[in-house]
Amino acid sequence: MALTVAGGVFLSIVEAPAQALNLNRLGTYSTGLFNQTAAEISAYDALSQRLFVTNGATNSLDILNISNPQAPTLFNSISLNPYGGAVNSVSVKNGLVAVAVAATPKTNNGTVAFFDNNGTPLNSVTVGALPDMLIFTPDGTKVLVANEGEPEPISTNPVTNPEGSISMG
């Protein structure tokens, strides 16, 4: 049976005995919001020792300083309102941060906004409808985006149902 490198890594983790895995809590960070989508997707940047967290409650990207993992602190919070609707995902590679933002309505084409690891805006590009997941290529030169293309609710007349797509750039 042939396995890919990623598959081999996955299998070696799955096959490891439970006793070999030991997770300990190092620290916590609270947004101060309860029962809201205040922290959904996160991405770590080793260069800056920062954690980038999508905050759906405030439609922002929260940047946490985790150089001391026992005491994470809020470094910056970036409003994503200028880029469209709801924040959906974040990815980081070599100090470059990409954030997927849906349009309003979600059936329109969304945006990927780029920032440096301090939160300074660099650029933004239009992608397909409802960009939901994004990841940098291993060499960090491109971003792959999964655009869900979900329809509006049935109560909308006429119903708009955009195609799902993949964007790369």
Predicted regions, residues:
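C-terminal segment of classical bacterial N-terminal signal peptides
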Residues: 6-17
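Bacterial N-terminal signal peptides that target proteins for export
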Residues: 1-2
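Mobile, glycine-rich extracellular loop/lid and propeptide segments
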Residues: 19-169
